[in-house]
């Protein structure tokens, strides 16, 4: 196939990001309202569902074994297709068992895709350009999310679209974009052949620790913040969509600049600033009793989270280039571990 100027690894990463966001952002935005309205979920059931969602994350380390059979790029396509199928089917199974099943299917695609995407990004991008490009990908994801939340706001607020229709459109869009990537982009090869076995290196200990602790923090945000908005403050689907739109407008405006900032000031200063800011945000979360203030904290947390790309660029600088694929799976598993532990400790199982 003759290659064109637009058929570059960077553009492929951008299209992958758009496809994933269209499906996953829809799933996340509708989840709390859908499970409460259609399946009468309580905190216990949502906790079980979120734990099921993390099971494939535990298995992310098996990525290296799959890569013995297929290329990383092809595996990314397959994972995105599975993600799209899982989301497309979600609206048609509004029962406890059905939601657990579709969540698991969606999660298999999502977690394997995220693992492979991290590996491919660090292989395809140079050390100098990685912070800026990773920041740009966050901005692209925010723009795609804005499209999703605008669609949700209009679809449920004015067009009265059903959950089934919205889920199917989102998952189908992801699947169609995946077919486009499969047929429209050539196979890119890594300059450095990747090791195809599991490994843990002592000199990567700080990267493992930062990734592990980041997983616990994200669980608080990903699960409790959204559920809090619906349960405590009575946010509707259109309210959640509007909040997410505001959030992603900020990310669209600042994410690329944050990536450039990380490249300029270095990973240590960037992460120090992030953690100091998050200390203030989560302290405020403990005392908030206003829906407006809760929404503001939600946006602030997302902005600080953009600085977490510094963890990836730090690893890119210290790692053996041949370790990207094998370490990505181990690192993603270390993100998932504290999440399930946190859910167990939260009392959702009791």
Residues of each region from the PLM?
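Short amphipathic helix-loop junctions that connect adjacent transmembrane helices
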Residues: 29-45, 223-240
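Loop-to-transmembrane helix entry/capping segments in MFS-fold secondary transporters
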Residues: 43-44, 127-137, 237-238, 321-331
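Helix-to-loop junctions at the C-terminal end of transmembrane segments
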Residues: 60-72, 156, 254-266, 350
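Intracellular juxtamembrane helix-capping segments at the cytosolic ends
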Residues: 112-125, 306-319
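Glycine-rich segments within core transmembrane alpha-helices of 12-TM secondary carriers
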Residues: 132-150, 334-342
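C-terminal membrane-cytosol helix-exit motif in multi-pass small-molecule transporters
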Residues: 152, 171-190
């Amino acid at each position: 196939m003759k290659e064109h100027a637009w058929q570059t690894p960077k553009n492929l990463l951008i299209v992958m990001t758009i496809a994933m966001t269209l499906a996953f952002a829809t799933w996340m935005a509708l989840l709390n309202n859908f499970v409460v309205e259609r399946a009468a979920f309580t905190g216990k059931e949502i906790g079980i569902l979120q734990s099921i969602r993390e099971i494939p994350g535990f298995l992310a380390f098996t990525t290296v074994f799959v890569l013995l059979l297929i290329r990383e790029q092809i595996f990314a396509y397959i994972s995105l297709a599975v993600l799209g199928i899982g989301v497309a089917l979600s609206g048609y199974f509004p029962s406890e068992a059905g939601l657990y099943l579709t969540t698991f299917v969606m999660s298999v695609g999502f977690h394997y895709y995220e693992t492979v995407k991290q590996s491919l990004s660090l292989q395809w991008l140079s050390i100098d350009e990685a912070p800026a490009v990773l920041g740009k990908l966050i901005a692209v994801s925010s723009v795609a999310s804005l499209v999703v939340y605008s669609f949700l706001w209009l679809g449920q607020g004015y067009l009265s679209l059903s959950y089934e229709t919205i889920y199917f459109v989102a998952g189908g869009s992801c699947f169609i974009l995946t077919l486009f990537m499969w047929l429209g982009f050539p196979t890119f090869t890594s300059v450095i052949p990747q090791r195809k076995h599991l490994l843990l290196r002592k000199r990567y200990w700080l990267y493992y620790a930062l990734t592990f602790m980041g997983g616990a923090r994200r669980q608080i945000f990903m699960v409790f913040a959204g559920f809090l908005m619906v349960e405590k403050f009575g946010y509707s689907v259109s309210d959640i969509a509007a909040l997410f739109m505001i959030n992603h407008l900020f990310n669209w405006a600042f994410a690329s600049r944050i990536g450039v900032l990380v490249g300029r000031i270095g990973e240590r200063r960037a992460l120090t600033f992030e953690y100091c800011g998050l200390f203030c945000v989560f302290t405020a979360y403990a005392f908030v009793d206003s829906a407006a203030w809760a929404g503001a904290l939600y946006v602030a947390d997302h902005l600080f989270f953009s600085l977490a790309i510094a963890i990836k660029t730090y690893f890119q600088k210290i790692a053996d280039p041949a370790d990207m694929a094998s370490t990505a799976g181990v690192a993603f598993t270390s993100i998932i571990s504290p999440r399930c532990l946190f859910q167990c400790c939260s009392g959702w199982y009791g």
